[in-house]
């Protein structure tokens, strides 16, 4: 996969661009350098162009390898840029503090990137400890140029506490004394002394030795061969650019194209400079033969060789890179009479290459883009001040305000005179509490404690008691837990978010008309609807494409809108990157339908490569987008937790369980856990066909893993999967899918998605009965009888014992508390199970699943994975898995500290004769004399303590025993059946997972 380089160089194609430094025009034909920044308007990078001399004032490249197209500029220009990069030192050495010592030009430039001052506010955070820098505290600046903001705006100031800067100064590049920091002279005398003490001179021996090692390394290499290679590149560059200049001045574009095609080479389209490079390379070194992998005829010189620009498949670019590609002599068509063509040599020549790798920071940035930010905590550990993140509102005498504010600030707190939702506590007097002003009344309404000024003295003496003192020293008889009112610090991961993801709305409200949603960005949702033809053709399209090679995760929405009242039409389209604010939209107005349809179809063809009329037989075209099959139905507006005019006839515990199973927020949280895009793929909108296609792609990836597939095939399948199931990666690059763990995780996601789709479709079902409570309606839709058990009944106590006894020793993260037990009778299931009721070896066994899956499970029963699903994750093949240890199944409920409610099933399972296994064995068909598979684990419930019910069903509720002599790779028993009729769900338990 390509490395995303931060800079680009070329000879300007025209004089339209302006320099981002001096703001003057960049004349055509001169060298210009760009910082490549994320475009705010489309899913890709855009160049911010600079004059060569202006570029180095605003940017700090550390390697010529970071500059795209560097290898295609003149040799003398390359050398000059490399020299300028060498002058871009980012380390301020101790030399400047010596008398008479002069700094280098690079150091003088870099010293401007540092500064010291008093914090103007308390908003900025320290980049070392990640805590806020309080107002009037000393802070030190390092301006960086390699961040998203720094690249875009020519530098981003990052602030540090003095102590944190001191610990990171080697990394930040300041080895000099603190008194040489710009701004030092503005500090107070005491503060100057503190800074000098914290930042003494560091001798830069380490830097010198690094330089020395570099020189020694070069000496060890064959200096003669380096010189020879450099001379060869210089000569070749001179000859190549002689041709290039003559081609540019004399040859027409048509003749360039004809010359390339005569040599069986595909001309570059849409980039005049690259076309010039391609023709000059042909005349200098000979004609390139087609790529052996994809048969592509466009190989372009790129960094360390010739990169094929062809397509391996309609989903994947070719990744072939050749250092010495095969060539043949350049053919000159007889009708081309340019004089300089006589200088073309008969025999092809090998192009000399000097590869300059990208800088370490660029490589690391690309790795983090692929993997996502690692949450490794702050770089510097620093104790927080006692009132950190505590906002104190003052209702105090004016004469005390200044003194109190200073004390609070020194303790790390923030002060306000307004009382808001963000206020933690109010500092006031007993008299003010007695007086009960409007502000004090508001404090009471918000449940804010009122504390005296003595509180500050107590905190100054013992900072650890800051929270407890609020309650113990309170002057009022009201107040909620103050700990819940402290502002939660933003996590590192959210701080490192892109500027294009921080303001993305979590969801959007769609107004549905005739089953189709008008995009609210059009501004026409109240006056127009999506046009549907007489043939029921819906002029509403969502296209998408994910390309991990180019870090693209794009969408394109296209709608033909018709006015609700007048004979008026619009074509609306919006585009961008999924999960970000990157993108734009456009609305075109039409007075007649024919013109609107023509434009709609032209745009569809342009973006997808397919005619709108043929969309049912869509064929993916390389580099073009693919339709996402989304069915926009009316969003559910039913709030099951709200009061309803008609009372429910169900027991309260059953009502609660229905609310849980049909909780839309819970469904949305589950989808967001899987990084699914909630705007392009809202709840209940992705078609079954699309999900089945995604299953097939996962199966294909699994087979590639098993068979050792090529990287290109993994890229191809990854692009297809993420296009079918839109994911929100923000500005991060979509990860390559090439491990069984990823396949298993995504299979579980699709399993959950199917069940969520099922539950949501039940929520959408229209019901003619208006005289029924919504909870009762959804209960009826499940076609399942749920009867709560009496908590004092023998049955309840027996099942509670089953839970208590079979919690495995290795599952210590949580305890299980039984909240409710329901007797379950699914409609038609007893009849289906009847033939197996006579089978021997029937047991009551556990099955756990996500809470959001249960509406689907109860409405259609437990299911076996579809044929198109990958086999990964199924130790014993595709079947329904059960356990006799409660915690073994409980782990599949996917609960957490924050979502601690889970549902579990106890089912009567007809096991009959079991095929016993002690290690993974993928079962596609059981032997004729077996009814189920038994994965025997080393630990199991004591069989002698099992209870046999009157109907012959075994309840294995004995305490665990371990068979140390058994050689098994399984810790606990697993029971698998391959026929859904062998299951009869009998109980559902609502569990509280009490995490430790």
Curated annotation (Swiss-Prot):
Residues 647-764 form the PARP alpha-helical domain. One of its GO terms (cellular component) is nucleolus. It is found in: Nucleus. Residues 220-358 form the PADR1 zinc-binding domain. GO terms for biological process: double-strand break repair; protein poly-ADP-ribosylation. Gene3D superfamilies: 1.10.20.130, 2.20.25.630, 3.90.228.10, BRCT domain (3.40.50.10190), Poly(ADP-ribose) polymerase, regulatory domain (1.20.142.10), Zinc finger, PARP-type (3.30.1740.10). Keywords: ADP-ribosylation, DNA-binding, Glycosyltransferase, Metal-binding, NAD, Nucleotidyltransferase, Nucleus, Repeat, Transferase, Zinc, Zinc-finger. Pfam families: BRCT, PADR1_N, PARP, PARP_reg, WGR, zf-PARP, Zn_ribbon_PADR1. Zn(2+) 1 binds at residues 19, 22, 51, 54. Residues 286-329 are annotated as: Zinc ribbon. A motif (Nuclear localization signal) lies at residues 211-214, 232-235. Residues 773-996 form the PARP catalytic domain. It comes from Sarcophaga peregrina. This is Poly [ADP-ribose] polymerase. A zinc finger (PARP-type) spans 7-89, 114-203. Zn(2+) 2 binds at residues 126, 129, 161, 164. Belongs to the ARTD/PARP family. Residues 370-507 are annotated as: Automodification domain. It comes from the Eukaryota. Residues 1-369 bind DNA.
